[in-house]
Design a protein with these regions (language model features):
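Donor/substrate-binding cores of folate-linked one-carbon enzymes
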Residues: 1-71
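Internal anion-binding site segments
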Residues: 62-130
């Protein structure tokens, strides 16, 4: 995952890149935990580049817009995704569950239980209840 500082243009995330920071998402990190890390790095990248932006002394890197995708907020209906019937303990299922864990807005309901954390260990999904 990562954060990118871009020069704003008329598109969505289509402007040239000023700077970026990449980081590894750990196997058991929830969407909400990842969001908080993204916010931390967003602040860091902004502070790092603030003075050079004010002075107009920064380099721009054009991006290949053919490699990008955009999904609008309305393209995902979370209410249809959060009720999960867990039948198999797979990494794919674990990733799906943890992608929906965002306590300010929703928690996935797995086999009837609100889940605040999913841990994948020894090919098993361990669910922590709300």
């Amino acid at each position: 995952s990562g954060v990118t500082l871009r020069k704003i243009d008329s598109g969505i995330d289509s402007g040239p890149i000023v700077d970026s920071i990449k980081f590894i998402i750990k196997q058991n990190t929830t969407a909400y935990e990842n969001y908080n890390v993204l916010m931390k790095f967003s602040k860091k990248i902004f502070i790092k580049n603030f003075r050079s932006i004010l002075k107009g002394k920064y380099n721009l890197i054009n991006q290949n817009l053919k490699n990008g995708t955009y999904y609008s907020k309305n393209s995902v209906v979370y209410s249809k995704l959060v009720n999960i019937k867990l039948k198999k303990h797979t990494l794919t299922n674990h990733n799906f569950i943890r992608a929906l864990i965002f306590p300010p807005f929703q928690l996935p309901i797995v086999n009837g239980i609100a889940v605040k954390k999913s841990i994948f260990k020894k090919k098993k999904i361990i669910l922590l209840k709300k």
